[in-house]
Amino acid sequence: MIGNCLENVRKNVPLVHNITNYVTVNDVANVLLACGGSPIMSDEPDDVADITSICGGLNINIGTLNKNSIEGMFIAGKKANELSHKILLDPVGAGASKLRTDTAVKLAKEIKFDVIRGNISEIKTLALGSGTTKGVDADVSDAVTEENLDNAVAFVKDYAKKSGCVIAITGAIDLVSDGEKCYVIRNGRPEMSKITGTGCQLSGMTTAFIVANPDNVLEATAAAVCTMGLACLLYTSPSPRDRSLSR
């Protein structure tokens, strides 16, 4: 599944419009290039409709909101819906402030998303209308664990069914569901929490995956999540040369 989805990205080179945050914009662009996609960044309201029109997908990330970018998100999102383009929402920090929460909830209500990807606290905020997000990180009390896995799976399947899109909850254990099926992915790495932006990068990459695999959004999303975890695993695992030097 991963190989086929990634091969389709490399073969089709999907152009992805990213309205993302200022902290990770360069990293998101580079990850899109690395996986085989093509990035373009724009949040100016007078520009976004034209940019969205020439792209195959739209990645909306609310990490550094301002009035201009919020307006641009709604214009781009509605244009993407009009053109039947694939759209992903990354509700960064939803639950941490009224502006973030209100914006994320309104986006989810007014725009038809194919995928919503976030940590467990952000997704709970969207589903329940309030949350306990710790800044832009998930609250420890919300974390998906082996002990609460059944409840977490039931929650994500229920919200996916109600929202009508694929929901991806990422963390130490990742959950990806369309309301009927749920992938449980256990290749998260603790090192990923030591740098900022891995979630933002994943959202950009996931958008490329769903554009290149339009008939298999659930599988494409799960494949993107797996790919990110495997990339981190390969990077953090000692090479044979490193192991020999450590003896």
Spell out what each predicted region is.
Residues 1-41:
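Glycine-rich phosphate/adenosyl-contacting loop at the front of the ribokinase-like
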Residues 36-78:
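Active-site cofactor/substrate anionic-group-binding motifs, chiefly glycine-
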Residues 39, 87-88, 167:
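Hydrophobic beta-strand scaffold residues
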Residues 79-86, 165:
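A short helix->loop->beta-strand "cap" motif at the edges of active sites that frequently abuts
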Residues 100-182:
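Conserved phosphate/ATP/ADP-binding segment of small-molecule kinases
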Residues 125, 196-217, 221-226:
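Short, small-residue alpha-helix embedded
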Residues 186-196:
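Short pre-catalytic strand/loop immediately N-terminal to key active-site residues, enriched for Gly-Thr
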Residues 235-242:
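Conserved small/polar residues in nucleotide/adenosyl-binding loops
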